[in-house]
């Protein structure tokens, strides 16, 4: 595997993370049978205050951004990997980075149906604490069910 460099987000990364989000999010929503709930990153990031997260990282491989994440001290809230780089351990590298920078992270929500993401987080000690129903953040006209995953820090 080629080496992965993870660094803090820079404003010049915006277009690349839009593309990563928009392609990967469609897969995530399809797994949860929520295809019609898609919003492009340019909209979702504003509605969900993405740029207010204190930690936003990007992963670079072969000279291009291939993943991004956003998190607080308690929650890993966003993690998307470029579709062509899924299953290359990049998601794992991003989770490792987040847990190194914010070791108190103990909460993640995963859409029910997104089993690949659930398995990724389980490999880091997260377990399903409950399944919660509500509305999709940033797109409240859609009902969602999420795995509420926790871990001991």
Features from the language model and the residues they span:
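Conserved N-terminal entry element of GNAT/NAT acetyltransferase domains
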Residues: 1-12, 147, 151-153
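Conserved GNAT-fold acetyl-CoA-binding loop/helix
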Residues: 14, 18-47
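Conserved beta-hairpin
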Residues: 53-67
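Conserved acetyl-CoA pyrophosphate-binding loop and the N-cap/start of the following alpha-helix
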Residues: 59, 84-85, 89-98
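A conserved beta-strand-loop-helix scaffold within acyl/acetyltransferase catalytic domains
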Residues: 69-74
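A short, internal acetyl-CoA/4′-phosphopantetheine-binding micro-motif in the GNAT/acyltransferase core
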Residues: 76-87, 111
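Conserved active-site alpha-helix within GNAT-family acetyltransferase domains
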Residues: 92-93, 113-131, 139-142
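Conserved GNAT acetyl-CoA-binding A-motif
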Residues: 101-113
